[in-house]
């Protein structure tokens, strides 16, 4: 990896905060931005204090020509049996002179999206979770129809669905979030970008991207008729 100006963290769950990854990134990263308490974990892992900034909801910082604001999310935190909700979780607003971006982190659908939209929107691109959803935990992860509504609440121009295709945290198929959000987006006239993991996109002019998950050689997708070869 090249030198990295900053790393944004949303909360301390293992699928979002990996100790080995953080330690490997330290030599490359100028600044880690984290919600309250999460930065303390980085310090405990040996990250130099000068590289860590912790923010409460609605606090902002200027770095590298950007203004970054920690904004509310509806989720929870903790890494063990006895440390539940001792650290904060958040979403992020990222603003430059030309662009406004929103990163949801993990969140259930709540009226905070509309408030963030009123304060900071409209957004050129919203990066919103759609994945790991289930009817039994609607307050901490969004279903695709809620992701679409959050995008509209925020005043988003392009939607980039995140929190999918990696860790298997729910009962749905790994590719289902992509299919469902694209179906809903087509129905409601919402522009969606689905870059393959590791693929770059031009934030000034996002592209829809191909349905790459249908090309993955995987027994699960082949059963559903999406597999290749």
Enumerate the language-model features and the residues they cover.
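Active-site metal-binding motif and surrounding structural segment of the metallo-beta-lactamase
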Residues: 1-34, 121-127
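Core dinuclear metal-dependent hydrolase active-site scaffold
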Residues: 1-2, 20, 55-121, 197-229
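Metal-dependent catalytic neighborhoods of phosphoester/phosphodiester hydrolases
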Residues: 18-27, 170-179, 204-205
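Helix-loop-beta element that forms the nucleotide-linked donor phosphate-binding surface
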Residues: 42-56
